[in-house]
A protein has these predicted regions:
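Amphipathic, Lys/Arg-enriched alpha-helical patches that create a basic surface
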Residues: 209-212
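A structural motif corresponding to the C-terminal end of an alpha-helix
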Residues: 40, 164-175
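Conserved kinase catalytic-core helix
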Residues: 9-58, 67-90, 171, 184-187
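Active-site activation/catalytic loop segments of kinase-like enzymes and analogous catalytic loops
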Residues: 122-169, 184-200
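All-alpha amphipathic helical-bundle segments outside canonical DNA-binding/catalytic cores
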Residues: 174-183
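A glycine-centered beta->alpha junction motif in the catalytic cores
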Residues: 2-23, 60-67, 121-122, 146, ...
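Active-site acidic catalytic loop and adjacent metal/ATP-binding pocket
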Residues: 82-131
Length: 212
């Protein structure tokens, strides 16, 4: 463990009145880091063989388990359709962060350094950096587009960041529909984890229901 100086991007997004040009730069850096360091195709034979099973565990089995006591039957079916769609679109990569939202990215404006914090370190039953190419994008979507950290803090979303996220997805020719579906799914499945605040859970449910 080490002490790192800087400001969480979630705090900058929610509480600082920064020029749009600063956000353009920050989002460019985040996208470029993701594409440069968390995008290598997996070449390990054993991981390639077991990938379908692992991705099913991450996207489908986990979703079914967490959604069991939430939403109406019709809503759960719609959310699970998101899970099946995303799981079918995934491909294995060598390195995945696994929890890539703005509260896990530290930015030091003096040194212009970005630090990605608290990586998952597991994909299904597989320990390590192995993962899929959609999960980190979906995590960013559940925050930048659907406002995860704004919902947690109960403050207004940053609309410019939301629009900019879509703009950057288009610029990099990334699968917007799949990423947004994955982001909404991850927002839905994190609701049980926020058992300490029923009002927060309700805000998350409303966001999911309004976007199904």
């Amino acid at each position: 463990m080490s002490y790192e100086s800087g400001t969480l991007l979630s705090d900058l997004m929610l509480y600082e009145n920064m020029p749009d040009s600063h956000w353009d730069y920050i989002m460019d850096r985040v996208f470029n880091i993701k594409l440069k360091y968390f995008n290598y195709a997996c070449e390990d034979r054993d991981d390639l063989i077991t990938f379908s099973k692992y991705s099913e565990e991450m996207w489908i089995n986990k979703s079914e388990e967490r959604l069991a006591n939430w939403f109406s039957n019709d809503e759960r079916q719609k959310i699970m359709q998101l899970a099946y769609h995303v799981q079918r679109q995934t491909s294995p990569i060598q390195g995945m962060h696994g929890d890539l939202h703005f509260a896990n990215i530290l930015y030091n404006q003096q040194t212009d350094q970005f630090k990605f914090l608290d990586p998952r370190g597991q994909y299904g039953p597989r320990t390590g950096t192995f993962g899929d190419d959609m999960y980190d994008w979906a995590k960013l979507a559940h925050d930048c587009y659907y406002g995860y950290n704004a919902i947690v803090a109960d403050v207004p979303e940053n609309e410019y960041v939301k629009e900019l996220f879509i703009k950057k997805l288009k610029e990099h020719n990334l699968p917007i529909e799949t990423i947004l579906k994955g982001g909404l799914l991850l927002l839905a499945t994190c609701i049980p984890l926020h058992y300490d605040d029923e009002k927060r859970q309700k805000r998350m449910m409303e966001k999911v229901e309004n976007n199904l």
